[in-house]
């Protein structure tokens, strides 16, 4: 059963401007260490950061809170599996909010899709509740 759905579309140039204007302060405030390491290792840093920013926005929407209602940017982090597939890892308040969405005796699966085509980056999140066992 789907318990959450979110999407976000962002202009990569907006992230480029934030990186130029605020630099490391912006990166440290928004992105986890894993996200920073991944993005900094790529030639197109701004596209990578933009996709991850969009994924966080989409996740906050899927959780039903948005960013302003208690879920912190760093409570959500994109991790790439060895296959390259991106997944969303939740901690702290985001994890607590996820648990509130789940019916009794269900576990969550978070599906994440990210894409970019300059100047746009986009992410979709589907939160699925599956019965345990």
From Swiss-Prot:
Cellular component terms per the entry's GO annotation: cytoplasm
Any one Pfam family match given in the protein's UniProt record, by short name: ACPS
Protein localization: Cytoplasm
Catalytic activity, as annotated: apo-[ACP] + CoA = holo-[ACP] + adenosine 3',5'-bisphosphate + H(+)
Annotated binding of Mg(2+), by residue: 8, 57
Broad EC category: transferase
Keyword Lipid biosynthesis: yes
Enzyme Commission code(s) on record: 2.7.8.7
Cofactor: Mg(2+)
Keyword tags: Cytoplasm, Fatty acid biosynthesis, Fatty acid metabolism, Lipid biosynthesis, Lipid metabolism, Magnesium, Metal-binding, Transferase
Disulfide bonds: none
One GO MF term: magnesium ion binding
Primary localisation category: cytoplasm
InterPro entries given in the database record: 4-PPantetheinyl_Trfase_dom, 4-PPantetheinyl_Trfase_dom_sf, ACPS, Ppantetheine-prot_Trfase_dom
GO biological processes: fatty acid biosynthetic process
Free-text function comment from the UniProt entry: Transfers the 4'-phosphopantetheine moiety from coenzyme A to a Ser of acyl-carrier-protein.
NCBIfam families found in the cross-reference section: acpS, pantethn_trn
Protein family according to the UniProt entry: Belongs to the P-Pant transferase superfamily. AcpS family.
Protein name: Holo-[acyl-carrier-protein] synthase
């Amino acid at each position: 059963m789907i318990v959450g759905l979110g999407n976000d579309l962002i202009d990569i140039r907006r992230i480029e401007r934030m990186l130029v204007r605020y630099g490391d302060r912006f990166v440290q405030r928004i992105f986890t260490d894993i996200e920073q390491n991944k993005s900094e290792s790529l030639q197109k840093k701004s596209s990578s950061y933009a996709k991850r920013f969009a994924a966080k926005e989409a996740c906050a929407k899927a959780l039903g809170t948005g960013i302003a209602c208690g879920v912190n940017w760093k409570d959500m982090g994109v991790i790439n599996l060895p296959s390259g597939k991106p997944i969303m890892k939740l901690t702290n308040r985001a994890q607590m909010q996820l648990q509130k969405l789940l019916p009794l005796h269900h576990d969550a699966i978070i599906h994440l899709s990210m894409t970019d085509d300059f100047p746009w980056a986009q992410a979709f999140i589907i939160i699925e509740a599956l019965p345990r066992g």
